């Protein structure tokens, strides 16, 4: 890493590498291609008005499923939970998403990463070793859909 990088640039470089290692295709705007892989992470994604820019918006199979907020190493990640939740609620109209708000939220310095799964009724952020693979998020979305379908089926009997 260049010595003149800012702490935030170093964090983003580490986060890009972690996302890539987990199977995500990391892209900037413009030139976004949601078909570049099962999981695509788009940097600096403009959210709906009054919701700012998500450092990374996560797409699985062409649908928005989560957001990642990047901070420099040493930054207290718990303090930015409201910020990433704002992104999860601020998906621009017209973008495909299986859930609104977006269910999968990450906070990361590139060294420390925290995660919340809003599909869990008792969700909270917790430390994780790495960003999850796109296949894992797909499995969680399918399981949640199956649970809703089974609950509806049981209620209709």
Question: What annotation goes with each model-predicted range?
Answer:
Residues 1-157:
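ATP-dependent helicase/translocase motor core
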């Amino acid at each position: 890493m260049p010595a003149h990088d800012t702490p935030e640039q170093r964090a983003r470089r580490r986060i890009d590498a972690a996302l890539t290692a987990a199977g995500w295709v990391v892209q900037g705007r413009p030139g976004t291609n949601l078909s570049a892989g099962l999981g695509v992470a788009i940097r600096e994604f403009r959210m709906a008005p009054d919701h700012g820019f998500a450092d990374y918006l996560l797409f699985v199979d062409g649908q928005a499923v989560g957001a990642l907020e990047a901070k420099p190493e040493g930054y207290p990640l718990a303090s930015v939970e409201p910020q990433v939740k704002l992104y999860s609620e601020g998906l621009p109209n017209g973008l495909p998403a299986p859930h609104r708000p977006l269910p999968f939220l990450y906070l990361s310095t590139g060294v420390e990463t925290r995660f919340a799964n809003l599909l869990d009724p008792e969700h909270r952020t917790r430390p994780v070793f790495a960003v999850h693979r796109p296949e894992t998020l797909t499995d969680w979305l399918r399981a949640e859909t199956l649970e809703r379908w089974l609950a509806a089926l049981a209620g209709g009997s």
